[in-house]
């Protein structure tokens, strides 16, 4: 007798920024020492669990499952990181006004085809949410909300507002929702102030 392996999760619609937040889990990409937030599968699951739209899917990949299926767990993690890098390159192309590379476009489309399907809307405390059928033991299924976010960003008007931080060592991606469309920094308190301090140093230490 066969059993249905799929379960249903209730997931809110992901913000378009979610995919960029995922890409930004590797920080200081332009520096000599990039900072990796997702060094292990538990790191990935912990990050997903902190995202309201992905928490339910992250809970399906447990430590016990990873111990029982170590090769699948390693493959899932490697595929997730590869998807992160494809999303980052797509974002960088948008920020630069370039065409998204066909390899990255194909990788995103292939992952979307394997993502947990949205079966319809349900009512929840916030109003409405997606009913998602999932068996999240693949990177595409696990990252479904991130992938939907990336697809919505590429297909929507906000693709023209994707920027990369003007700090060449940072390279974080963000959607510029400022009225003037002139935001330069991922965070003014961090990269913006650092750039101001560097300019001040150069002005006051000219030989």
Where would I find each of the regions flagged by the language model?
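Cys/His-clustered metal-coordination modules, chiefly Zn-binding fingers
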Residues: 129-207
């Amino acid at each position: 007798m066969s059993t249905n392996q799929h379960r249903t999760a209730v997931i809110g619609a992901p913000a378009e920024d979610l995919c960029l937040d995922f890409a930004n889990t590797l920080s200081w990409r332009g520096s000599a020492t990039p900072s990796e937030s997702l060094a292990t599968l538990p790191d990935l699951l912990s990050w997903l669990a902190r995202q309201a739209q992905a928490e339910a899917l992250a809970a399906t990949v447990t430590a016990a499952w990873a111990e029982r299926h170590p090769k699948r767990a390693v493959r899932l993690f490697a595929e997730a990181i590869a998807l992160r890098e494809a999303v980052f390159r797509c974002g960088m192309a948008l920020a630069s006004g370039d065409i998204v590379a066909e390899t990255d476009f194909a990788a995103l489309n292939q992952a979307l085809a394997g993502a947990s399907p949205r079966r319809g809307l349900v009512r929840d405390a916030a109003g409405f949410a997606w009913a998602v059928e999932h068996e999240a033991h693949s990177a595409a299924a696990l990252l479904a909300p991130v992938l939907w976010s990336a697809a919505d960003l590429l297909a929507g008007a906000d693709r023209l507002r994707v920027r990369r931080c003007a700090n060449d060592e940072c390279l974080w991606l963000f959607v510029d929702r400022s009225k003037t469309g002139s935001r330069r920094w991922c965070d003014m308190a961090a990269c913006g102030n650092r750039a101001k301090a560097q300019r001040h140093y150069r002005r006051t230490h000219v030989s």
